[in-house]
Every structure is written in C-alpha cells, then in structure tokens.
Amino acid sequence: MDKLTFPIFPAADLVNFFRQNILTGTEAKNFNKNDIFPNPKPEMVQKLYMRILQQVFNYGVEQFYMVPMDLDIQYPHLVEGFAPVANILKLMARFLPMCRVYDFHPSDVLNPKGKRTLHSLSGIVNFLHFSATRKEVYFEYCSSYKSALENVRQLQKANQEAEIKIEKLTTVPPEQQAEFKALSSEIHDLQQIISQEYRAKDVAFQEKIAQRKTEFAEKNKRLNEQKLAIATMKEEQERMKSQIVESPEQRKSKTERMKETVHRLKQARQETNDKCDYYRDRVAFACMWQTDVQGYLKKLQGIDTNLEIHRKIREEIRHSEEQVVNLNLELKSLSNEDAQLKRIILVKKEKLAKVDIKNKKKQEDFNQQKQEILEVCSRIQEKRQVVHGRVAQVLQEIQQTIGKKEQLLETTEAGKKKCQEVITDFRAALEKYHDSLQKASERSADRRREKIAELNRRLSRR
C-alpha cells in the first residue's frame, strides 16, 4: 500500500467521476458517498464494478448472467444466482492488475471494506484517465495513418505513371532500332578510342608528375643540406671569432666573402623556391587536367551527336535531291501519259458514276446494319455492367459474412474458455463446500450419537 503508482482519490471525487462517466439515469442520481465509504454496500459496489467492466471490456449485461450449458453441474439452481458475482470476480481479477492493483481478493466484491474499495476505485479511475488520453493519441495515429496511406496511393499512382512514361521514352521504335544499334556501336567505338587515348595521356602525365615529385624531393633535400651547412658555418664563424684575433682588413675581406657566399646561397634558395612553386603549379595543373578531360569528353559526345544530326540532315538532303530528279523524270513521263489517261478517264468516269450509285446503296445498308449492331452492343454492355455490379456486391457481402463469422467464432471461443474456467473454479469451490458439509454432517452425527448415549446413560442411572 505504501508503494502506489497512483494517488488515492477522495470519496467525493470518485462519486463525481462515476456519476459523470460510468453510471447513467437513476443509478447516477442514487449513487452517493455512503455507498463506497466508510461502509461500502456490496450490492452497489458489485453494480459499479459491473458497469466499469461493461465499459472497459465492452460486455453486455446478459453476458454476466450467462451460465455454461455444456457442463454437468450437480446444482444448477445454485450456479444461476452466483453467475453474475462469479463473472465479476473473474473479470476483476483480470482487470485490476492492469490498474496496478495486485492485491485483489474475492472479499473485495463479496464483503468490501472502505479503504480497500477506495484503493481499487482510485486505481480504476487512474487507468480510465490514462486510457482516455491514449485513445486520443490512438485516434490521431489512425488519422495520420489514413492520410499516409492516401499519400502512398497517390505516390504509387504517380510512380506507375512515371514508369509508363519512362518505358515509352526508353523504348526504341522498331523502324529506328537498326539506326539506333548502328549509332550505339559507333559511340561505343569512339568511347573506346577516347578512353585509350586518355589512358595513354594519363599514364604519361602521371610519369611526368612522379618525375617532378622526385626532382622536387631532391631539391628540397639539397636545400635542407644547404641550410644545415649555413647554420654550421655560422656556428663555426662565431666560434672562430672568439678564438682568432684578426686584422681589420682580413676580417673585412672574410666578411665580404661570407656575404657573397650567403648571397649565392640565398639566390640558390630563391631558385629552388621558384622551382618548387613551378612544380607545384604543374602538379595542380595535372590534377585539374582530369576535370578538363572529362569536360572535353562531354564536349566530344556533344560534337558526336551534332555530327550525327548533321550526317542525317545531309542524307535527307541528298535523298530529297534524288527524289526531285526522279520526280522530274516521272513528270516528263506522266505528261506523255496524261493525254492518254485523259481519254481513258472520260470512259472511266462514266463507269465510276454507275459504281458510285451502287456503292452509295451498299454504304447506306452497311451504316444501317452498323447502327443496329452498335445498339445491341450497348444494351449488352449495360447488362454486363449491371451483372458485374451485382457480382461485386455479392462478393463484398460474402467477405463481410466471412469476417463476421470468424469474429463470432473467436468471441464464442473466448467466451467458452472463460465460462469453462469459471465453471472449473466454481466446481472446485462446490466440491470443497460439499466436503465441508459432509464433514459437518458427520461431526453433527457423532455429537448426536454421543448425546444420545449420554442421555441413555443418565436414563439408565435413574
């Protein structure tokens, strides 16, 4: 009791909560503080627990009064009166651990106490508050899930449309497949040639870069050696200054010579630095050359496409010129044949007039037959749509009935298991009760025999 995970509510707050959220009608009006504290009424507590269990487990009132009919019970009239209380005990033993109340006892329902009732009801109220907040979050998740499903459907539809467009764009028409294969083979050959040239140039540049790096390392090594020599010479100069006393002229000539050597060393150092900068620029240029080559490759590909377009245009122009020459020749031959055909046309026109009359009659008959066939097809299509709708409706009803059947089977199976558990518990309790009754009857019979024997002894004494 000291390690609760929920507060103990006052009796007045509990009464207000159950009036507003659990009880209805006259039950809410007649429910007051004295029903649960300090001396709870068992019938009111049982009714309150029943209403709470109805709301939590979605049970009907008739389910609390149901007695399993598939069990062989010795005294069914006793079970009928005890069925609601047994169902309440079973469900409360299952429900209260969810509310963090682990010390439930059947006496809390059969003979409730004030403090234990407040403890249990406070845990139930805390659980109901928590379930209400979680229910709101669950509904929000459901709404977001529905919107996400709708977005997924839209995206799938857009994806399918995009795939259809991609397939249309990627497929090559049959009349252009030969040309496409030829162009792809030419492009592949050009890419191989370009890649081979690029590899050769790349190898040459890499060799030059490696050579420049080795030269640069040698120059740096020489420069470091010269720096070390200058430092040693300066140290030697300082050491010799302290040991040798020279004339001013000799000292001046030596200092001039040393200045000249220092100047030469500085010039050599400057030259090496310039060469280092030059080689560094060459290395950077070699690194940048790769991006330029890639750009040149792209430009070459663009030039190849432009050349291909130019070749196609030239072929079309040549083909059109050939067609023009052929058409001129045909025009000359046709001009000769024109005179002959004019005479033939006059004869043919007369025949065509007769044939046109016959064709008009046939066309009218054909249009009439076509219209009749279209009307019959439209009627058949309407009937087909009606039948299809009926079939879809019947299939939907079948699916619904199958789902309801499965749900009903699951609920009946669960109810059957629960009833069997209650009956086994109740049978064990009845067997214990029968044993106790039998023992009590045996004890009373023994006492009766003892009293009769004592009375007989007293009567015999008299």
Swiss-Prot record:
According to its UniProt entry, the protein's GO biological process terms are:
attachment of mitotic spindle microtubules to kinetochore; cell division; kinetochore organization; meiotic chromosome segregation; mitotic spindle organization
Q: InterPro entries given for it?
A: Kinetochore_Nuf2_N (IPR005549), Nuf2_N_sf (IPR038275)
Q: Which Gene3D superfamilies match?
A: Ncd80 complex, Nuf2 subunit
Coiled-coil segments, which residues?
143-277, 308-461
What one GO molecular function would you report for this record?
protein-containing complex binding
Query: What keywords sit in the KW lines?
Result: Cell cycle, Cell division, Centromere, Chromosome, Coiled coil, Kinetochore, Mitosis, Nucleus
Q: Which domain of life is it from?
A: Eukaryota
Cell location = Nucleus; Chromosome, Centromere, Kinetochore
Please list the residue ranges that the record marks as compositionally biased, kind Basic and acidic residues.
248-259
What cellular component terms from Gene Ontology apply here? Ndc80 complex; nucleus
Question: Which Pfam families does the entry link to?
Answer: Nuf2
Region (Disordered) spans which residues? 239-259
Function (record text): Acts as a component of the essential kinetochore-associated NDC80 complex, which is required for chromosome segregation and spindle checkpoint activity. Required for kinetochore integrity and the organization of stable microtubule binding sites in the outer plate of the kinetochore. The NDC80 complex synergistically enhances the affinity of the SKA1 complex for microtubules and may allow the NDC80 complex to track depolymerizing microtubules.
The text of the family note is:
Belongs to the NUF2 family.
Fill in the subunit field for this protein. Answer: Component of the NDC80 complex, which is composed of ndc80, cdca1, spbc24 and spbc25. The NDC80 complex interacts with mis12 and zwint.
Protein name (database record): Kinetochore protein Nuf2-A
